[in-house]
Amino acid sequence: MPPRRSTTLAGTAAAGCLLLLTACGHGPAHAAKDAAPTPVGAAEAPAPLPVPRGGGSEVPDDFNGDGHRDLVLDTLVTAESHADDAGIGIVYGSSRGLVPGARQLLTPEKYAAPVGGRPPAVFEAEASCDLDGDGFTDLVVTTDPPYDGRGRPPVPLQLLFGSPSGPAGRAVPLVVPDRARYGNDWPERPVCGDFDGDGAADLVLHASTGRLSHLRGPFTRKGAPREAGPPVPSAGEAPTGPAADVNHDGYDDLVVRASAGPGGATLVLGGPDGPTRTGVTLPAGDDVALGAFGRGKALDAAVGSPGGIAMRYDLPTAARGSLGTPGSMLDAADFDGDGLSELVSSGSGVRVHPGRAAGPTARGAVAVRPATTGTTRVLAAGDFDGDGLADLVLRTHRGDTQDTVEVHRGSAEDLVTARAAVTFSTSQFLAP
């Protein structure tokens, strides 16, 4: 049986994660014009503020239901090198964007269900969606339950339910019925989506090589799905989110990678019975991204690798194309509001490549240069201020004890602003 694996929240900077609404390109890049308001610096970050209370919404990643997108921070700096981080951080959104003072720290001691009679040593965000349909986004986390290597391992996933004040109370273990399991692998790698088209969020998990578990929502507050059938066949073993309805048939679809690392991938189509149909086999690569790149009516796929990016247009038809730019890490969203996807490629640098009606292009690519030095990764690409334009959130870290998070606003003219509108450090979560 393979060893326990640790994964991160889908839609972040980890290589191999699938990100919705993506374009890609390569070529001369210019810095965007500075159209952002005066930044909120890390040193001037406000004191902790109460989490705004909401009444429920359909906005993604809205844990307090106030109609504004929130930011999940799965990696926080530590007071000393090599120390365990404090937990999972949430920075809450507003009509002005993210508010660093409105924050919440989810510690395993306070929020995790005990494993083996004690708080789990592992407590990491994996996926987020409204699993119980109450208008508040819920968080799927992974833990490290004890396992002696004999028989089926326990389910490591737990559900933290949102509320008017954000995630509240302890998480509950996710219930994966025996009939939905196959083999002796860890049930892991959760992907949210409405795969059966009934309007409720489901979860797809890895069951074993060649099998997926499909848990139909809505979920109870005890962590149980409405229904779960036998595992469904799959061409791979690593379901990858976020899901998307690529062919606009009312059923979410997802990419399943052959393994957790670089390699091949398959687009699996949803339907009344869930994600049971193979749509198209994608080329091997490091990362896969879905987006409205401009060709055809359906979504397209970009498959990134150090040697270039393979394009597959109008899925599942998958007309072929290519871009001669490295793309080992891909993130995406519509930053200029034209309805087409921009691609963010990161690794050695961060570039935003504009989408065009004929497909993604290298012309007019924007280089986003963080204000601080270090290792930079994309945390999120989404609309955090409600203006209809996606924003780009970057984290630059220098070792384990220093980092800076920057929010670059989307721009109809420049794709994203060169200067960050908001900056802060995750060290704010260390404060008592």
Listing of model-derived features with the role each one plays in the protein:
Residues P2-P432:
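Beta-propeller-forming repeat regions
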